[in-house]
Amino acid sequence: MNCPVRGALANRESALNVGIDRFWAPLAMLATQDIALRLQFRRSMVLNPEHLPHHGPVLLAPTHRARWDALLLPMAAGRRISGRDCRFMVTTTEMCGVQGWFLQRLGCFPVDQGRPSMTTLRLAIDLLADGQQLVVFPEGQIQRNDQPIQLRQGLVRLAQL
């Protein structure tokens, strides 16, 4: 699938400064956390939220078992709990079309899993250096089995830095 997201990574500085759109982020929280998640799960509880840092770099690497993960994580570790937004590294295919338009405004940025670039890794490093909260699903895709996860090289490199 051809999707014009590579150009968005060319200027890392703008990706750092744009961040989370002030208009779309509250609407996304309302739609996901207050409506969709409550309808789907009725009740949710975050255990030990005091363990989430409120400042400084945070790298979250949760397992990815369902599409709900990307909605549940900001509810469990995002703005309402930690006072911070989650910046997701997502696949290039996720950043296409209307969905990609919204994801970009919510602070997501793409990684081409077939040909990961140093630019993407550098942006992730820059976000962490800026004290932001970065989310990377270590499997790189939804895994619905009970097998041990295979970490992608980029996450390993990122965690080592």
Residues of each region from the PLM?
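Hydrophobic alpha-helical segments of integral membrane proteins
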Residues: 28-36, 99-102
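Polybasic, low-complexity association/targeting segments
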Residues: 8-15
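Soluble, non-transmembrane catalytic domains of enzymes that act on hydrophobic metabolites at membranes
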Residues: 1-8
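Helix-enriched interaction subdomains in cytosolic or periplasmic regions
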Residues: 17-31
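Soluble catalytic domains of membrane acyltransferases
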Residues: 21-22, 39-161
